[in-house]
Amino acid sequence: MEANFDSAKFRQVLGHLPTGVVVVTGVDATGAPSGITIGSFVSVSLNPPLVGFFPGNASRSWSHIAQGQGFCANVLTSEQEELCWRFAREPEGGMSARFDGLDWTKSPSGMPVLPGALAAIDCSIESVTPAGDHSFVLGRVQHLSANESVGEAMVFYRGKVTGVTPA
């Protein structure tokens, strides 16, 4: 059965569903850092602890991260809009140029952790499954950290980034 709508309509309607915003970071085969903004990060399982996300198949950033053994999902705060867009656009000057001027650290497994992130979820890559023009990346959580004092979480809603505060 063929869909009776185009991709613009699909995106517009699904934009009514708020999604969290993370920057998935990793290192390529040479150890150079890379990152990509993701709005499709999900919890998959508590036992074992699994998470997932859906990068676009054409993403150069994901192709660099996929060369490594893992990734770190950096949960952004509503104050980190610049970081959101920095990692959403194709970088000028190479993949690691996105990290220029950032005081980032390394997770226990060596993945980049962005400064001021609300949480960092350090994972090994379990599997990558094709899903249309995207892939589903399943990660096993190895380490977790949260910074409760940095602010409200960033969400993407109806084409814009905003924040959400716990009730």
Ranges and model annotations:
Residues M1-A167:
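Basic, polyanion-binding surface patches
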